[in-house]
Regions:
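Short edge-strand/loop segments of extracellular domains
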Residues: 131-133
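Boundary/junction segments of secreted and surface-exposed precursor proteins
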Residues: 32-47
């Protein structure tokens, strides 16, 4: 009988200790997740009349121009999406994030003579975002990519290298915690 009571008391104590430890463990994971968060989405203008849409989080970055007309009349569509994330640096005090990695950059062109071209390249990138909500200012997003110059028509010819697509947000927001 004494052994039975001792054993059940031991089980009760062990359960209480396990419950206490698990709540401590869960608590610190929650705090860490809250302290390291960066995400955003919205639109900004990369050139007058040329709106860009972006989304990012700590696992993915993408940016696109759904429709744009270049100075020579060429119609352009662009889509860029990360294929890897190499680093994520969050500065919670400054409310900024810098994300680096590789992404695919695809540009569809329709020239004024009716011909078309599709340009595809995998490029290194650096995405940067700033959450300006505390100051009441517009949030900011930029995406810098490094294009390769090749003998034929390529994205280097269109945008140079490095090329930075950046602006204050017109819609959407950036959240850095």
């Amino acid at each position: 009988m004494k052994i039975g009571r001792y054993t059940s008391g031991l089980h009760r104590g062990l359960l209480i200790a396990l419950a206490a430890c698990s709540s401590l463990s869960t608590g610190s994971l929650t705090i860490q997740a809250q302290a390291q968060h960066a995400s955003g989405g919205g639109t900004y203008f990369v050139a007058p009349g040329m709106r860009s849409e972006f989304q990012f989080n700590q696992a993915h970055v993408q940016c696109k121009v759904g429709h744009g007309v270049m100075p020579d009349g060429t119609v352009m569509q662009m889509f860029m999406a990360s294929t890897s994330i190499d680093s994520v640096s969050i500065d919670s005090a400054a409310k900024t994030v810098t994300i680096t990695g590789s992404m695919v950059s695809i540009v569809e062109l329709r020239f004024t003579d009716g011909t078309t071209a599709r340009l595809t390249e995998t490029v290194p990138y650096t995405a940067f975002a700033k959450d300006n909500s505390a100051s009441g200012g517009a949030d900011f997003f930029s995406l810098t990519v490094v294009y390769t110059d090749t003998p034929g028509l390529d994205q280097f010819d269109l945008f140079g290298s490095p090329a930075t697509f950046a602006g204050d947000l017109v819609t959407g927001n950036v959240v850095i915690k």
